Amino acid sequence: MELPDLGFRPTIGAALTRAAAEFGDVDYVVTNTDRITYAQAERRSALLARRLLAHGVGKGTRVGLFYPNGTDWVLWWLAASRIGALVVPFSTLYAPGELAKGLRLGDVHLLIAPSRAVSVDFAVFLEDALPGLATNAGTQIAVREAPYLRQIWITGGTDRRWAHAVDFTDSVEDVVPQEILSAVEAEVCPADPAVMIHTSGSTADPKGVIHSHGVLMRQSAFLSGTMNGFAPPGLPTRYLSAMPFFWIGGILHVTGSLHSPLTILTLARTEPGAALELLERERGTGIAGWPTLTQRMLAHPDFSRRDLSSCPSLVDLPADLSLVAVPGNVPRHRSLTESGGGFSTTDVLVVDDTGEPVPAGSEGELWIRGPGIMLGYNKREPWEVFDADGWFHTGDRVFVLDDEPGIFYVGRSTELIKTSGANVSPKEVESVLDRHPSVQSSLVVGVGDGDRGQEVVAVVVPADPGTFDADQVSVDIRRDLSAYKVPRRWIVVTADDLPLLTSGKPDRRELTRRIEAGLIADGR
């Protein structure tokens, strides 16, 4: 398969150097409180990279980032990427227990976090996540919950003895010389692992998906053409990125914008009123995100009062529009059950249950392979991830059309729940519920929902039906589960109420059908 010629070495560092040289004065990332140009991003991330090198961080070192969307996230991501470190971004939606699990599964050596963001005191949060942390002091820490973790850097000031306080000043103390950084960057190659993203899967533990520099740069190359297509004539492309930077959609935005002079508008928390204000102030020309945000923006009372003439795609098109990038500059009008987009340098196959290809227009499971996909899963051997012919079986139910470049998403072959664009593993939620003293056993299923795609529903056999309190259980499990994973509906049953397969295992499909048909009532 022929790989596209990007005009530069496909690494994040090389792309940044080129961007700073060719359009350095253009805004790269703009928030409601801060902004950086491409040139500023290059200069400031270089200083941070030199500081990382001075502290022993280098190629392959696993660096965790625990920041919301913003310029700080981008600067640390660039700094670590430039020296070949493996960036492990963590969801700011995580509960303390989830962060501890991510640090352990990801073998993270260095964690970088702000002192406070989105009303969260991260020092307190980290001490809750890692109970042994508070007793640590000095430059090297050791906690049983995350055995590889040796350093935690905090920006914005901290009084914790276990933390190393860092800032974004131009001080050249505590850094290696510039020529060392240049020599290090020359050794970073497209094949090097660049990022590991933890995503919910069919197992209780999240999977660490590893992508290389080359894959990220090639897969994101289409973004500039697509987003430029939404900008009115004469206006620079400035689009609202409503995807979290700690997930693959957001990472493709920050990498894709390095290809041409695009400006990313983003918020630490994407609230529709604040998004409308930012779009108006910055003359935003498009939106890249899930359709639920677009719908909420259109329904917001400030929508009619904002001057959004620079963003005709939001003003003129239907309420369920989501501007999703697809190759060939094709904007796609889509609902929650459709997804525009193809894959660069990737073979795509849609197959039936026997593995045979299905004709265009027919639903099947999506298989992908080639140089455009992930390197693999963390701590998994290749044969555990790919089949003998190199295909990755995604578990996504899709269809394609002869005259369309996109892939249309229908649902999941697996039990994975997709709610408001996020994946939820039923087994992960069940493992937390089943540890709760009020729960004898549980089943978690996804039930169709018009706004979210699917709603997380817990079917619980309580330890004591007379005292079971779903509201209290919801509060209790938030230490170990992100808010979007906490069930929104609770159904209390007896063990005899659960439909079973001939094997004696619960029949999840039949259970879901009964809930959707109203044959099993909600209860607390």
List where the protein language model places each region:
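Conserved AMP-binding/adenylation subdomain of ANL enzymes
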Residues: M217-R238, F246-G286, H300
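AMP-binding/adenylate-forming catalytic core of the ANL superfamily
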Residues: R50, Y94-L103, L111-A113, I287, ...
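Conserved AMP-binding/adenylate-forming
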Residues: D192, L262, P312, D320-G406, ...
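Structural core segment of the AMP-binding/adenylate-forming
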Residues: H55, L86-F168, A299-S304, D464-G466
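Conserved AMP-binding A3 loop
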Residues: T37-A39, E185-E187, A194-A221
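Conserved pre-ATP/AMP-binding loop-to-beta segment of ANL
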Residues: G24, E145-A146, R160-H198, A204-D205, ...
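Conserved AMP-binding/adenylate-forming core of the ANL superfamily
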Residues: P4, F8, T17, D27-L78, ...
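AMP-binding/adenylate-forming catalytic domain of the ANL superfamily
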Residues: R150, S482-S503
